[in-house]
Amino acid sequence: IQSTSMDQGILTEDSMNSFIRTLIQAGIWKNKVPKQTARTKDGTQTTVKKTEAEADAMVSKDTRLSFQPIVSVDAELLRQQRRFSSPRVLLSENTPLEPPPLYLTEEPTVLNRTSRRKREGKSHRGEYSVCDSESRWVTDKSSAVDIRGHQVTVLGEIRMGPS
């Protein structure tokens, strides 16, 4: 912001408060307009403030450079982070030695929800299942095990409404 000799009169408190509000709203007060050094005709250096447009261009350029999206996570970052115990996720720079237990459908313990109780106490590296599930419809079962471990009968047909 540049001022001329005509603008350098005494300012009242209200006009100063109004001026500060305008600066804050414009974001200039917070960012502080950078100064440039320039030489006058006689060779002495003076400080000249950049124009508002130049300052805005610099601020927007700096903003774009500082907010770049993160594409990948560096292994050094994983080493620096404090290790934590989580039942679902383990951050590691090494790949797991075996696939997670969720995808091992050959095991009979994976087929129902009570298998979570059986898996407790084991430590696995890699992914953990939030819940056990099957990714296909089962149409030919007449009995099943509920979440409490009790044997229940599966209804072949469900009647709705008055009969």
UniProtKB/Swiss-Prot annotation:
- Where would you find this protein in the cell? Secreted
- What residues make up the propeptide removed on maturation? 4-119
| Superkingdom assignment | Eukaryota
Report residues carrying sugar chains. Answer: 112
Listed GO CC annotations: axon; dendrite; extracellular space; synaptic vesicle
Keywords, in A-Z order: Cleavage on pair of basic residues, Glycoprotein, Growth factor, Secreted, Signal
* BP terms from Gene Ontology: cell surface receptor protein tyrosine kinase signaling pathway; modulation of chemical synaptic transmission; negative regulation of neuron apoptotic process; nerve development; nerve growth factor signaling pathway; neuron projection morphogenesis
Q: What are this entry's molecular-function GO terms?
A: growth factor activity; nerve growth factor receptor binding
One Pfam entry name: NGF
- Tell me which positions the record assigns to the signal sequence: 1-3
The record's comment on protein family reads: Belongs to the NGF-beta family.
| PANTHER family on file | NERVE GROWTH FACTOR NGF -RELATED, NEUROTROPHIN-3
The role this protein plays is: Seems to promote the survival of visceral and proprioceptive sensory neurons.
- Protein name in the entry: Neurotrophin-3
> Upper taxonomic classification of the species?
Eukaryota, Metazoa, Chordata, Craniata, Vertebrata
